C-alpha cells in the first residue's frame, strides 16, 4: 500500500473530503492506511468486487460489505455516488 500512496499521495485527505466532518478518518501515529482506507484504495484502483477485496485483504466478504456500507452512510455527498467519487480521487476529473 506504500506504492499506492506514492501514486495517490493525497488519497487520505481527498477521501476525508468526501465524509461529513464528524466522521473523517484519523490515522494512528505511524499508520498509513487503516482497514477502511485499504478497502477504498483497492476500489480506487478499480477492484470493486467485494469477494476479490476480501481475498486480497484476508477479511470476510461481510466485513468488506459492512465497511463499504458504513462509509457510504458517512458520506458528505450523495451516498449512491460515493464510490464514483472515490474512483475520481487523483484523476483529472476531480
Language-model features, listed with the residues they occupy:
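Cytosolic nucleotide-binding catalytic cores of signal-transduction proteins
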Residues: 2-94
Amino acid at each position: 500500500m506504500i506504492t499506492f500512496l506514492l501514486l495517490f499521495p493525497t488519497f487520505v485527505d481527498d477521501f476525508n473530503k468526501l465524509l461529513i466532518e464528524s466522521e473523517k478518518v484519523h490515522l494512528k501515529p505511524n499508520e498509513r492506511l487503516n482497514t477502511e482506507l485499504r478497502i477504498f484504495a483497492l476500489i480506487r484502483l478499480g477492484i470493486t468486487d467485494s469477494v476479490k477485496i476480501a481475498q486480497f485483504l484476508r477479511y470476510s466478504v461481510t466485513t468488506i460489505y459492512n465497511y463499504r456500507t458504513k462509509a457510504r452512510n458517512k458520506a458528505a455527498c450523495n451516498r449512491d455516488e460515493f464510490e464514483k467519487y472515490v474512483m475520481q480521487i487523483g484523476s483529472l476529473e476531480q
